[in-house]
């Protein structure tokens, strides 16, 4: 196997819980995606507030300096439902298995929390389909849960619910769901 093989690259990656010291690296990683409107722009304060939801992928060089090359978050929305959010990989490493490793860790976390369904809103339909997600049309919650979720101030929850005020953020995205 050559040194440029995606599997070799993925094996050099460590996935771990994010720390507050990772926020500047997350900011740099996410800025390109938000500029291109692939991901919602998140205020830096929101990254700090939500850091406990994040996992990061880092790559160490020969001098043991680690670089954050990917991230993803799992946001619990209800007792049986969570959302994969802010899944991003350094564009130079796309296709190297970094996103796969991060998503695997997020799904493992969902299982440990007792969540049975995981939702995402994405442009990367092929990636999520390969991991068992299926496209859905409507918001997959009962009316009582929907009414309770309306009380959330979280923009991601508003997107999940398809609220009119966030429609511009979601144009072209696909709603996808995975049953664990």
Model-assigned labels for residue ranges:
Residues 41-55, 59, 70-89:
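A conserved beta-strand-loop-helix scaffold within acyl/acetyltransferase catalytic domains
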Residues 141-180:
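C-terminal "cap" of GNAT-fold acetyltransferases
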Residues 95-108, 120:
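Conserved acetyl-CoA-binding loop-helix of GNAT-fold acetyltransferases
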Residues 112, 116, 122-152:
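Conserved active-site alpha-helix within GNAT-family acetyltransferase domains
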Residues 22, 80, 123-124:
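A generic "binding-loop/recognition-motif" signal
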Residues 2-40, 58, 64-67, 172-180:
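Short amphipathic alpha-helix that is part of the acyltransferase structural core
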